[in-house]
Curated annotation (Swiss-Prot):
<dbReference type="GO" id="GO:0005536">
    <property type="term" value="F:D-glucose binding"/>
</dbReference>
<keyword id="KW-0324">Glycolysis</keyword>
<keyword id="KW-0067">ATP-binding</keyword>
<feature type="binding site">
    <location>
        <begin position="8"/>
        <end position="13"/>
    </location>
    <ligand>
        <name>ATP</name>
    </ligand>
</feature>
<dbReference type="GO" id="GO:0005524">
    <property type="term" value="F:ATP binding"/>
</dbReference>
<dbReference type="Pfam" id="PF02685">
    <property type="entry name" value="Glucokinase"/>
</dbReference>
<keyword id="KW-0418">Kinase</keyword>
<dbReference type="GO" id="GO:0004340">
    <property type="term" value="F:glucokinase activity"/>
</dbReference>
<keyword id="KW-0808">Transferase</keyword>
<dbReference type="InterPro" id="IPR003836">
    <property type="entry name" value="Glucokinase"/>
</dbReference>
<dbReference type="InterPro" id="IPR050201">
    <property type="entry name" value="Bacterial_glucokinase"/>
</dbReference>
<dbReference type="GO" id="GO:0006096">
    <property type="term" value="P:glycolytic process"/>
</dbReference>
<protein>
    <recommendedName>
        <fullName>Glucokinase</fullName>
        <ecNumber>2.7.1.2</ecNumber>
    </recommendedName>
</protein>
<keyword id="KW-0963">Cytoplasm</keyword>
<keyword id="KW-0547">Nucleotide-binding</keyword>
<comment type="similarity">
    <text>Belongs to the bacterial glucokinase family.</text>
</comment>
<dbReference type="InterPro" id="IPR043129">
    <property type="entry name" value="ATPase_NBD"/>
</dbReference>
Amino acid sequence: MSRFALVGDVGGTNARLALCCLDTGSLEAVQSYPGQQFDSLESVIRTYLQAQAVSVTSACIAIACPITGDRVAMTNHSWAFSISAMQRSLGLAHLSVINDFTAVSMAVPVLPAESLLQLGGQTVQPDRPIAIYGAGTGLGVAHLIRAGERWISLPGEGGHVDFATGSDEEDALLAALRTDLGRVSAERVLSGPGLVNLYRAVARVAGRTPQPLTPQEVSERALADHCPDCRRALSLFCVMMGRFGGNLALNMGTFGGVYIAGGIVPRFLAFFRDSGFRQAFEDKGRFKAYLAPIPVFLIVHDNPGLLGAGAYLRQHLGARL
């Protein structure tokens, strides 16, 4: 009989939970819960487990914040907890809590080919470093390397590096952003809230008053071509995603590929493919030829975080991915 474990992918907005088959890595009973409706992550987990007919003794939860010890406090949510205390309370023999992009990175080796859409470059070079990043509520970043028969994720907080401009227009936008935000990190432009920040900066630099729009409204008006400032903001978002991805590729020579996750880009996929993304990715002066063969993939799997949390746990328990 197959053994199951609990896996989770917890972001600033929703908590997704599923059962992972430890034999095959497949996911079952995927459920999503609005985080604001629960006072703790443990209460979400209990609600989910009570609805399942399977008992679990192991779990891996991916969460959108730095994991530096036993105490976890989310970056974009009020939830905070002790890993060891929650493990005892839930009666689990094993509980791993990992960064959300550690999970996404661990999904890469097990993603089916149909879950990847290539955006330029050539073929993946086996056993070379991999970069993963993605815009959602925030900007997540991780790298992945192969060490013998194991995959090792190298998480970090790369979304909070300084935002780097690449044109006079972007210099002007950075000045406008700095007026509102002080220090401007990459996440301040490459995220859902970041798209709104970009729109507001574009409007202000043009001498117009920005409207109070949501990220979805900015992208919808851009795609409908009903708002020049929204459309310019979305175009710049794509370019900046390319430039940021190129920086990641340079950092570690990621000839194993660069993978884009997150819930934002798939909403305007055709626009993204036709944008200046790939040109900006390769626009590194003397190192353009170095970056040109590196493939970029958009992850179109519905739940890469859950898949990766399962892969992380299975490898930890001795499986070979």
